[in-house]
Amino acid sequence: MTRTEKAPTRGGGAQKNRTGQVWAAPLPLVGAALSAGLIAVAVAGWLTGVGEVGEIADPGAVTRWGLPMSRYIHHIAMATAVGAVILAAVAIPARVGPRSRQRRRDQKAVREHGTTGDEHPLFARVMQIAAVAAVVWTIAAIAVLVLSYSSLAGQPLSTSEGFSTGFLGYVQSIATGQAWMTIVVMAGLFATLVSAVRNQAGLFFTAVLGLTAIVPMALVGHSASGDDHMAAVNSLGLHLLGVVIWVGGLTALILLAPEIRRQASALTAKDQGGPELVGTLLRRYSVLAMLALITVALSGIINADLRIESLRQLLASPYGVMLTLKAAATLGLAAIGWMHRSWIIPRLAGAHAGPGASARGLEKPALSADPWRTTRMLWQLILVEVALMAAVIGVSAVLGRTSPPVSEELPPDATPARTLTGYDLPPAPELANYFTLWRPDWLWVGLIVFLSAWYITAMISLRRRGTRWPIARTLSFLFGLAILFWVTSGGPAIYGMVLFSGHMIQHMTLTMVAPIFMVLGSPVTLAMKSLPTRSDGTRGAREWILWLVHSRFSRLVTNPLVAAANFAGSILLFY
């Protein structure tokens, strides 16, 4: 949506009219930014040769070029759909007016925006964005499923009986076909749920369903073959998780920009902090974006290390060149994110500090007197960010069809153990080997690092506020995480793949030792004391933890009788 304010003049009259207003990115520019990904697909396809005619069996130009473009649309649509639901769950109030009187006053404004009941206009719009993106995601997943079979079989698209029979076998018997069929079903179910649910539990399970679709995506492609299968799959899963939260949230945010502008302008007219609304949304998203950026960068390095063995392969091979371009773009995105956190957000936060800010000790940033200019810089930066993200995802769609320099085939002299598990047999299971052999499981490593960093940060935050936190609880929680790291990345994990005794050590330690020390650390109590409480109707980490702790499911599974039956029954069922 284009701005309606007049351009500034030297006389300053127009400047006065626009003061306190906010600027929103026009939707055509958003479309242009997203189309950068299609351009990246075309350029990367030409550089890597994935669009060239096959030497043995050619599926046709429609499949050669349609498959990477469908994958790009799939990735963008999936990220936008899931990111929009996450944004609705953590950053946007579901209802207008905390009190019935305020709610009645806002009913008229809500109806003017096409919503029903007392649903907040921003919430209604972001869920509409999620619904449309989910439909596109489902259609794109179907396209990828059909085109991937056409590419694998080397047959052009057709309605012949032979193509249909082969496609049915592909979906039923081939891992890639099964994975993409699963994604199609999950995307369709997600699209149905996102159009129907509006309560807290519905948002939670819809978001979980969308994020679960990452699993089949991580299990196919380059990660499904080659060396160190577990590291490749887990690092790719973490990479996709970060991309969905980061790219999806930002794309949903910029598609929401016109509605944000309307709401912010209405608040500004009432002198209730319109620019501050923009700053609040951006600040909440930026926390998720920062965590996602770290996850994407580190998991990308791990995954690249499995595909590239030398600097020559990185700089000379088509696969390596594309990885280098992705890394450079990611650094650029990190720089833009730093500008948001250190420059834009503080100015928007101070935009509604008011004339008495100095007396209250609130120094207003230099540009906060002109929120129009600040919000324009904000959305222009986000447009550049979305274009870079789209280009990176476009390159990734082509990389999925490009052979890496490192061979993905097992060597001819591979041992039976390596053929079955992907790893050679470890040394004899001596006691020392259980503590000296290591094979990092990056999924667990990422979770452990996050929990450790959060716990220490929360404890320091409490101490700065003058609240003491027992050091014994901290040591207990960190010791439990250390045990968790050992059992998932140390000797028990290595021997657990080939020996039943190693597997039982891993199982029992996971269920009976590590949880005890972690529970003694009282992480939920620490979260309740350290996390801020929100009063604007949105649900932050504290509100979601409270909801989970007091949910019926939580009360059921924590009942001593149910917990005992679950523990004993799982052992009987599996062994």
Report the location of each language-model feature.
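Polytopic transmembrane helical bundles with strong interfacial aromatic enrichment
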Residues: 2-439
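Early transmembrane hairpin module of multi-pass membrane proteins
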Residues: 65, 71-72, 79, 143-144, ...
